[in-house]
Amino acid sequence: GPGPKLRLLPTKVTAEEIAQLPGALAPVQGRAPALILGVEESRLGAFRFDPNSEHHLYLFGDSKSGKTTFLRSLAREIVARNTPQEAQLIVVDRRRSSLGAIPKEYLAAYLTTNESVARDMAEFVAFLKERLPGDDVTPEQLANRSWWKGPEFWVLVDDYDLVVTSEGNPLAALQPLLAQAGDVGLHLVIARRMGGASQAVYERVLRSLIDLGSTGIMLSGNPDEGQVIGRVRPVRALPGRAIVVSREAGTFRAQLAWSDPV
């Protein structure tokens, strides 16, 4: 008889469609479901991100490879799974690509210039430092993070290559807090073009994300860029088709969730 049919990744799939897959909405360790990022190739199951156990993400890709779409899909997942009291977004968007994509009650700041990023980050870091646990915090409080109340903050950065310039990086003030993200309720998600990525991974903030074992995502790119994440080189691919490098799950291919522009 005919051989088994190869089940292939879709070329376009929405988070709503992925949510229908078995286990896509299963709670993680008794807590809320993880955020749906896409579909994994190996088992054609949901590729998920649990913000309780992982804090940050970074992604590289050529233009039109799906970076902005990924950030838009992620923002919509955050909004779908949280109240505005639970999650607030700070969006750094030099090209204004995501203007209007996030309901204003979830939007703490929408920053389009490096000057506004530098100014707001200084205030934001001062605010987050107030959340750092003091000497009087008990082990129980540490376990359930009950010594402060308020939303988790998601800093979503598009076109990171336009944000980091020869003058410096207006996000540098966040770097010392990245390792304590769980204590202060911080998530940093960076999207950058693939050109020059193999050098960009030595920039301080991005290097911190990598050193902390954050999940990295590579969309379409020129293989000549060389090894970008670990030993993995980019490949030319369809929009949204990704190579994911995860500390927990290893390296796998995925199709990232599509979401329509505003």
Model segments located where?
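Phosphate-binding and hydrolysis-coupling loops of NTP-dependent motor/remodeling domains
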Residues: G1-E41, A46-R48, A191, S198-V262
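P-loop NTPase catalytic phosphate-binding loop
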Residues: P27-E140, N144-S214, G221
